[in-house]
Amino acid sequence: MESLRIYNTLARDKQDFVPRQPGEVRMYVCGITVYDYCHIGHARMVVVFDIVQRWLRARGYRVTYVRNITDIDDKIIRRAVENGETIQSLTRRFTDAMNADFDALGVERPDLEPRATEFIPQMLGMIEKLEANGYAYQAKDGDVNYSVRKFANYGRLSGKSLEDLRAGERVAANDAKEDPLDFVLWKRAKPQEPAGASWESKYGAGRPGWHIECSAMGCTLLGAHFDIHGGGQDLQFPHHENEIAQSEGATGQTFVNYWMHNGFVQVDSEKMSKSLGNFFTIREVLEKFDAEVVRFFIVRTHYRSPLNYSDVHLDDARASLTRLYTALKDATPDAQPLDWSEAHAQRFAAAMNDDFNTAVAVAVLFELATEVNRTREPALARQLRLLAGLLGLLGREPREFLQHAAGAARTGALEPHEIEARIAARVAAKQAKNYAEADRIRAELLEAGIALEDKPGGSTEWRRV
């Protein structure tokens, strides 16, 4: 198989992927802060990196995939206080909700899923190293901060210079930071904070800053220097920039070789956000659309491109996925393994090896579906199912999807028992030679999004359209 090329944010270009250890990939992705239900932007991130790890494994790599959980944070503390519940109760509840949402989307669990609160000693150890190396200082307010001007390569990932970043910054008269760009490593506990919000340390009771959490977990679980670090585009600066400064300042080694960032989800060409009121949780979306349709909607756009969310686009994704399942409905795949020498498989692999270009890979699936429709060839049906499976798609029985998932979540959609009752009435009308009534029922069902197919022998199959 040809070499894999990955767009490396650090290099601002595609590069051949060469893992540090032959045949082995270590990858860290910034996960969720568990204080609320996950939104469609989170869905995109986890589906994107789910596909990355699936493709790496398909290429034969031994992958260690780490995706963390942030279970201590200012937002978590505020929400727990607002709700009158403990931090642990809040984070446990939303971790369970997160897992349910991601499972529904067909996202495979990471190999390791560390919780920030499990790594407090490692975070403090890294902070102490940074202090010893001259990168950290304890301010007069008790916080421990990172001194960005001490790190020569600060801004390399984001392409921002310290001078550009300082432009427009104003330092308050009582600001404890030496530089307005300095960021917190350890936040001193405040008297009004609830139980479970702080830990004892040589710097006094407090909790870790967000950035040090990922540095410590990544270095502890994958080593000081690993292959791939990923996350949403919004994390490039300051989070990932700060991770580099912390990790390399503490260890003296290159932190990560390849940085990957997925693009934003947009609504009406604006970034989705709570402040704009164009915010959709995964649960809200799954009330209207089948989970595999949502996954397909994400997969068919290249991960670095903006993803425009709308019901119209999801309806189109449903119709497109229905086309793929329809191709498999009357062509049973054979039981042979995937044939990588076959032309469609080669084009699919070429797309995926070109920076995980799922948009082109999905186009290959439609080319293959056209051939399956034309030939009903079991070998081609197998290729379609197995290639789609590498994207986490087409894993269900076609008739199950076509009858129960393709459009079933639409408002007013007919239930299966209602459809079967109308088919029975149509059969009775045909037996009574009342063909006008039989045609009326067929047209009525089609208007409701149900297509009928009369089979030899007198049976009738149906599917949603």
Curated annotation (Swiss-Prot):
Catalytic activity: tRNA(Cys) + L-cysteine + ATP = L-cysteinyl-tRNA(Cys) + AMP + diphosphate
A Pfam short name: DALR_2
Biological process according to GO: cysteinyl-tRNA aminoacylation
Binding site for ATP: K274
Domain of life: Bacteria
GO terms under cellular component: cytosol
Keywords: Aminoacyl-tRNA synthetase, ATP-binding, Cytoplasm, Ligase, Metal-binding, Nucleotide-binding, Protein biosynthesis, Zinc
Keyword Cytoplasm belongs to the record: yes
UniProt motif 'HIGH' region: location: 32-42
Main location: cytoplasm
CC cofactor: Zn(2+)
Coiled-coil region list: none
Location(s) in or outside the cell: Cytoplasm
Transmembrane segments: none
EC number: 6.1.1.16
Ligand binding (Zn(2+)): C30, C214, H239, E243
Free-text cofactor note: Binds 1 zinc ion per subunit.
InterPro entries, per the entry: Cys-tRNA-ligase (IPR015803), Cys-tRNA-synt_Ia_DALR (IPR015273), Cys-tRNA/MSH_ligase (IPR024909), CysS_C (IPR056411), Rossmann-like_a/b/a_fold (IPR014729), tRNA-synt_1_cat_dom (IPR032678), tRNAsynth_Ia_anticodon-bd (IPR009080)
Subunit annotation: Monomer.
PANTHER family: CYSTEINE--TRNA LIGASE, CYTOPLASMIC, CYSTEINYL-TRNA SYNTHETASE
Family recorded in the similarity comment: Belongs to the class-I aminoacyl-tRNA synthetase family.
Stated name of the protein: Cysteine--tRNA ligase
Source species: Burkholderia mallei (strain ATCC 23344)
